[in-house]
């Protein structure tokens, strides 16, 4: 039984940040009911290709993007623009511990589904709103997108190659880091609010903003700036204070070499057949290497190109030089450590084939998270939830379908 098996979550979110929070809670055992638009559902259901393939190898209508953030949930289709749909959500909220939503600021108020309205039917409700810029401030009513937030929040100013070198300029992260981190911070906030509720009986409203999270994620870069007044700059895959501490291209791929001291530098160049570099006064110490970075790094780059990725990893690991490969995802899921940790899971799907997903990375001895059910088909649980939770009979459900309220 999961640690959160006593918790029910009403998930009114779409795309990534909110669904990521809901999926995390579901992994730990929470009963998550995902509210979706009839006939369309979560936008990400259609964000393909690639799509999940059925037992015959043909594409289904389930986009891989949607599959990433929606396992362990029940899907209920409700049109919240209709009075009947609004009533359904209110009745479900009255039987839930948590409501998650990521609508624009104020949008749910016109439907009577904002925090104040739902608190009236469930006084101890934990209600988490996820938006781009939060419920207050001059940007509150702007739409928030991860890419834009990475720029506004400073992440891209410190990510990417240095200006003035080939490929220089700001870069976004390869995944939606602001969305994902907001999902995780939202999970933490929900759990803290539930702990407070359990002690006091008091619910509360949680106001999560992608921009707030993105700014917070810069961590020591923030404090470096706040202490010095000097904005940090991009260093690409290099380190501003340590050389060599960066990526290098081998004859068949890329590796990371993270030399942390002068002894490791000597071992690195000895492994590469260039021991004289360690005795060169320009490179003998780290401060000297930092000063002569632009001279040293091209020499090392030519040295590294002479061997394969595997040959370098074997040689440097044997010499005690910190290093690692830069793997593509095919290599990641074939990696012996990733395999040993069971990071890939397969769950049966109604399409007749298994859906391959990535397991929750948390390991717990008593209440581990679990991937129990595949991401649901659109509306797969509508009838069951209305019947079992709300007591609707078949005639009432049929009438709601005729009105396109569900």
Q: What is the meaning of each model-derived region?
A:
Residues 228-245, 360:
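Active-site Gly/Thr loop motif
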Residues 135, 165-177, 198-214, 233-240, ...:
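Conserved Rossmann-fold dehydrogenase catalytic segment
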Residues 284, 352-399:
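Flexible, small-/acidic-enriched active-site or ligand-binding loops
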Residues 163-164, 183-204, 216-227, 269-276:
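Oxidoreductase and adenylate-handling cofactor-binding alpha/beta cores
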Residues 243-319, 323:
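Aromatic-enriched alpha-helical interface/lid elements that frame and gate functional surfaces
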Residues 39, 133-134, 210-217, 252-254, ...:
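Glycine-rich beta-alpha junction loops
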């Amino acid at each position: 039984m999961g640690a959160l098996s006593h918790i029910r979550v009403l998930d009114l979110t779409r795309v990534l940040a909110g669904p990521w929070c809901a999926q995390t809670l579901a992994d730990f055992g929470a009963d998550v009911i995902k509210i979706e638009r009839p006939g369309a559902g979560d936008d990400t259901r259609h964000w393909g290709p690639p799509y999940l393939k059925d037992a015959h190898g043909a594409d289904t209508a389930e986009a891989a993007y949607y599959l990433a953030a929606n396992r362990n949930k029940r899907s209920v289709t409700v049109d919240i623009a209709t009075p009947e749909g609004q009533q359904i959500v209110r009745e479900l909220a009255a039987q839930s511990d948590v409501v998650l939503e990521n609508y624009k600021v104020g949008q749910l108020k016109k439907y009577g589904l904002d925090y104040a309205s739902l608190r009236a039917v469930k006084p101890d409700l934990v209600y988490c709103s996820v938006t781009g810029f939060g419920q207050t401030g001059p940007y509150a009513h702007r739409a928030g997108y991860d890419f834009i937030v990475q720029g506004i929040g400073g992440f891209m100013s410190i990510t990417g190659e240095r200006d003035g070198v080939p490929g220089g300029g700001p870069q976004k992260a390869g995944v939606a880091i602001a969305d994902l981190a907001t999902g995780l911070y939202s999970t933490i906030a929900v759990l803290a609010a539930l702990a407070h509720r359990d002690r006091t009986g008091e619910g509360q409203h949680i106001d999560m903003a992608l921009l707030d999270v993105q700014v917070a994620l810069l961590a020591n870069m923030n404090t470096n700036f706040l202490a010095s007044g000097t904005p940090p700059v991009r260093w690409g895959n290099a380190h501003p204070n340590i050389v060599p501490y960066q990526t290098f291209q081998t004859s068949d791929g890329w590796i990371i070499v993270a030399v942390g001291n002068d002894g490791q530098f000597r071992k690195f160049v000895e492994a590469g057949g260039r021991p004289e570099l360690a005795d060169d006064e320009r490179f003998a110490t780290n401060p000297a290497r930092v000063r002569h970075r632009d001279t040293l790094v091209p020499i090392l780059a030519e040295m590294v190109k002479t061997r394969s990725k595997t040959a370098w990893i074997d040689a440097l690991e044997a010499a005690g030089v910190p290093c690692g490969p830069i793997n593509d995802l095919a290599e990641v899921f074939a990696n012996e450590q990733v395999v040993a940790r069971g990071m890939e899971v397969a769950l049966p799907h109604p399409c007749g084939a298994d859906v391959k997903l990535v397991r929750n990375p948390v390991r717990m001895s008593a209440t581990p998270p679990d991937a129990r059910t595949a991401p649901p088909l659109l509306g797969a649980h509508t009838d069951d939830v209305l019947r079992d939770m709300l007591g609707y009979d078949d005639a009432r459900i049929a009438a709601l379908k005729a009105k396109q309220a569900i």
